[in-house]
């Protein structure tokens, strides 16, 4: 009989190391540790080791590193031919880091199949807003005029982007945000977007399952490549969403 295992309880110090991701449980898949806090130092340390927080309001903070791990190759995000035809006629525009708090708010408010309530608690929102103000968390935003119709946010460490959540205020808004993020990262030589856990929507857009060992190897390599933290807004500017039809996206 396999002995019952519990996740490791983290020390209270933000600088306390995480246990190796390979020590995560298989049931529930990927649960590694419990406790700690959501300070910028701890969050950045977690992502740099392939670990992310995911828990419900009123519960202890849970830290995860599932096996396999869902990822997007930045040259592998798929948009259907039908959606591309709609996009070519669209007047939507795309920006970066101009509405981070609106994006995370909208992600928290979006209903998710099979989930009762949101995992993006008020504590989580404040933690990622703090990371954004430090230049480590970023959003891609899709606008119809002045109205936000889609977005995605996540954390950048080195040349690795860790996606956290996305939303659609109108049909296709999250697809455009993800495709725009992938196109931008691909152009800058960033090969991967972490998508955390499997779901049918991600698979339909080209997400792949990576064995955790391979994912951790890729993360280690990419986070070691220095990138200056800071806002992406000025560098990114504003683009027509229809321009995505002319990129490398399949």
UniProtKB/Swiss-Prot annotation:
Gene3D superfamilies, alphabetized: Leucyl/phenylalanyl-tRNA-protein transferase, C-terminal domain, Leucyl/phenylalanyl-tRNA-protein transferase, N-terminal domain
Any GO CC annotation of this UniProt entry: cytoplasm
Catalysed reactions, as listed in the record: N-terminal L-lysyl-[protein] + L-leucyl-tRNA(Leu) = N-terminal L-leucyl-L-lysyl-[protein] + tRNA(Leu) + H(+); N-terminal L-arginyl-[protein] + L-leucyl-tRNA(Leu) = N-terminal L-leucyl-L-arginyl-[protein] + tRNA(Leu) + H(+); L-phenylalanyl-tRNA(Phe) + an N-terminal L-alpha-aminoacyl-[protein] = an N-terminal L-phenylalanyl-L-alpha-aminoacyl-[protein] + tRNA(Phe)
Subcellular location: Cytoplasm
Pfam families recorded: Leu_Phe_trans (PF03588)
Enzyme class label: transferase
One GO BP: protein catabolic process
Database matches in InterPro entries: Acyl_CoA_acyltransferase, Leu/Phe-tRNA_Trfase, Leu/Phe-tRNA_Trfase_C, Leu/Phe-tRNA_Trfase_N
Entry keyword set: Acyltransferase, Cytoplasm, Transferase
GO molecular function: leucyl-tRNA--protein transferase activity
The EC number(s) this enzyme carries: 2.3.2.6
Protein task: Functions in the N-end rule pathway of protein degradation where it conjugates Leu, Phe and, less efficiently, Met from aminoacyl-tRNAs to the N-termini of proteins containing an N-terminal arginine or lysine.
Family: Belongs to the L/F-transferase family.
Entry protein name: Leucyl/phenylalanyl-tRNA--protein transferase
């Amino acid at each position: 009989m396999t002995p019952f295992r519990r996740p490791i309880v983290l020390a209270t110090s933000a600088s306390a190391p995480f246990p190796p991701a390979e020590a995560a449980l298989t049931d529930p898949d990927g649960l590694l540790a419990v406790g700690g806090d959501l300070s910028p130092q701890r969050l950045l340390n977690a992502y740099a080791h392939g670990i992310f927080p995911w828990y419900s309001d009123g519960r202890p903070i849970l830290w995860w590193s599932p096996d396999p791990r869902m990822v997007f190759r930045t040259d592998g995000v798929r948009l259907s031919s039908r959606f591309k035809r709609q996009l070519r006629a669209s007047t939507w525009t795309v920006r970066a880091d101009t509405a981070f708090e609106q994006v995370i708010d909208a992600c928290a408010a979006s209903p998710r199949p099979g989930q009762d309530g949101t995992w993006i608690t008020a504590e989580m929102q404040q933690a990622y807003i703090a990371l954004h103000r430090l230049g480590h968390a970023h959003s891609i935003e899709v606008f119809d005029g002045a109205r936000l119709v889609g977005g995605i946010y996540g954390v950048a460490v080195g040349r690795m982007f860790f996606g956290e959540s996305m939303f659609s205020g109108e049909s296709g808004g999250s697809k455009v945000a993800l495709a725009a993020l992938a196109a931008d990262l691909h152009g800058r030589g960033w090969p991967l977007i972490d998508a955390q856990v499997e779901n049918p929507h991600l698979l339909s857009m080209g997400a792949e399952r990576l064995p955790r060992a391979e994912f951790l190897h890729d993360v280690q390599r990419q986070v070691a490549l220095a990138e200056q933290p800071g806002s992406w807004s000025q560098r990114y500017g504003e683009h027509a969403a229809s321009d995505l039809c002319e990129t490398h996206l399949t």
